[in-house]
Amino acid sequence: MPADLNMKVLVVDDMVTMRRIVKNILKQLGFGNVDEAENGQEALQKLRADTFGFVVSDWNMPVMTGIDMLRAIRADEKLKTLPVLMVTAEAQQSNLIEAVQAGVSNYIVKPFTAETMQEKIAKIFK
């Protein structure tokens, strides 16, 4: 099943530049309904208040990390099936294993290309 380009996507990163880059790539890929949050706590508030179809999140953020947000999403009855793509500088195998164990849908290591993001999203929604 291909991704629904009309679904609401949440981009979570404490760096405004990174949020802008990810949003621009998502728009290039056809996703027009993109919101953003600065950390996992803000993201969870938005996810619980609205209906999102997909989350793209950084790992290292203040207040609440992406991995802690992912665990909270998977523990939440309403949100637990929400696809989450982790986009992070954390390239160590132990980080990938931790993310997989926490229930990540897919994982991209920074820096990355639009093509890489497109491939990872396609795998999530196939």
Question: How should each PLM-predicted stretch be described?
Answer:
Residues K23, D68, A91-N106:
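Alpha4 helix (beta4-alpha4-beta5 surface) of REC/receiver domains from two-component response regulators
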Residues E36-Q45, G66:
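Helix N-cap/capping motif at the beta->alpha junctions
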Residues M61:
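Receiver (REC) domain active-site loop signature in two-component systems and cognate sites
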Residues T51-V56:
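Active-site beta3 strand of CheY-like receiver
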